[in-house]
Amino acid sequence: MKLVIQPLLKSGVNIMEQKHNGIIFTAIPDKSNEYYRPFYEDLIYFNEYLNENKSFTDQLVSLSVEEQDFHTSFFEYDDIWLRDVAPVVTNHLVKFKYQPNYLPKDHWRYLDQQFNKWLKKNDFEYVKSPLILDGGNLIWNKKDTVIVTERIFDDNDDWTEEEIIEQLEWDLDVSRVIIIPAEEGDVLAHADGMVKFIDEHTMFISDFLGDHEFRYNVQEVIQEQMPEAKFIVVPSSYTEKGQYDQEIASAKGLYINMLETCDAIYVPKFGLPKDREVLRYIQQHTEKQAIQIHVGEISTMGGAINCLTWYCPDHLLPSKMKRLNNQNEDFSVRKIFDWF
């Protein structure tokens, strides 16, 4: 018992009085969904594992039509990739148009409409942008800079490049928008598979599977607008073995796709020999707690921990969710399920 209590006392954490700093949202599709059916048990395990291993200051809520052993928001959202459809978080929330060219029109329209209904139902306040942008294609340094890939130009080809950048600056309230090249052949072309800010000027950057020329090119593009930028190369252990979707490359072994909250960085765990080494490496470069979350089989569908989640800090949550967020962990799961 002493071994458990002493570290908590030293860090000043009182479990009974712990206030959460934000909510991590996930989504669980219906069991009948043919595309996700082979991964249903993996998705439940992912949520259970995340719930059991998350930071004391984080809460987990999953959009689901079934009760689970973790907190749920009763809502039908028949997909798992929340990051791309959800509002982008800067100093406020910004909801971009969700119209990915890698999905059929009826599919993305349904997902966008459903998620908008959920946002409205729960009284989220956000700015609407006229631009098309997946949430996974925007990285913010928590101050004045965002990074997106050049995919945004293709998705908004009725705008000039200058107009797009000006609109992003206005919507996001930033002074610097850095456009980086997308990886060749990457259907998604998301920045969250390439870079990750860990402070105002320092970022993790993928090793791009040993493609040094491309990595140097990305770094040069960033430093042209951000001369003070520093880079920490995150190793990968990519394997296409078991890739599920012929059109979308597996993300297994791509550790750069991390989720950051106020007090923690959640690192993908793939069941690969390099998992532990990468976790130690990440922990060496952040003062936040690095927590590894298993996404092994799920990642073969083309995404990892950041793609699967949407984190909203407490100050941007609607009031009724703040009430949930400040409840103790022993608050009734059934009560929470009924709230939303």
Which residues does each PLM region occupy?
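Histidine/cysteine-enriched polar flanking segments
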Residues: M1-F340
